[in-house]
Amino acid sequence: MDSRLKTFLKFIRIEHTIFDLPFVFIGIELGLLKTHIAFPYIKIILIAIAAILARISGMTINRLLDLPLDRENPRTKHRELVTGEIKISEARTIFIISSILFILVAFSLNILAGLLSPIVLLSFYLYPLTKRIPIISHFILGISIGIIVLAGYVGISGSFPMQWQLYGYSVFVALWIASFDVIYQDQDREFDRTKGIKSIPVLSQGKIKVPVLMINLVSSAFLIISSLGFLNLIFNLLSGLIIIISVHWIGRKHIDTIFKEFYLPIPFIILFGISLQLLL
């Protein structure tokens, strides 16, 4: 792979972008259930492209706004903006182009998606700006990902979501992502404390298991009550069980291992359960 392309993919955290796509497809599937239209391949591809563009825009602005902190944080000194592998001017260009393209693709789907597209972008931009407000930044990040469930629905149907289950799934995603951000931020607890960042790890003095468990219990409850039928319920119960078990391994396994073993499979399990329920 070309080294510049590899650097770009690393900069935008392409693996996290792929991780988000199943949440978009939850909204798409429920939107197709409402509209009863033939499988719109082009539209689905455009929605996936829009999700990727939104994530690129959000990741880029996050890196730009966090650059002063990243330069001082030993854990983030290897990041591409800090090392100069990606120039600040290049990052700004990536941000502008991805944001504009996202809005254009959203309008190409339907008017409502286009009009609501700035809200999706704004949710990504708020995350780095709220890190000094106690606790809230974890949930802002969660909302920015949870909202894409609704965005998938709007993109495919052109209307506001009416099924309460869709909002339940959106809340589940928001809380579940927030719980992982708490685990992730624990890596920077001492650094964040010196910089006045009031994350849950800082406020709890590193005792994050209880808050993470509480968030995961609530998120799992939303996941289970949002089930569309028996088959969907089985897979959601399995996902909820994995989510709760993951708390046990905090501090026992590296965060990357927790992500790969307990977080990465969840969206695919849930999506498979929904797909199976709707097909049978």
Language-model regions: role of each:
Residues 1-280:
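Multi-pass alpha-helical membrane architecture of UbiA-family
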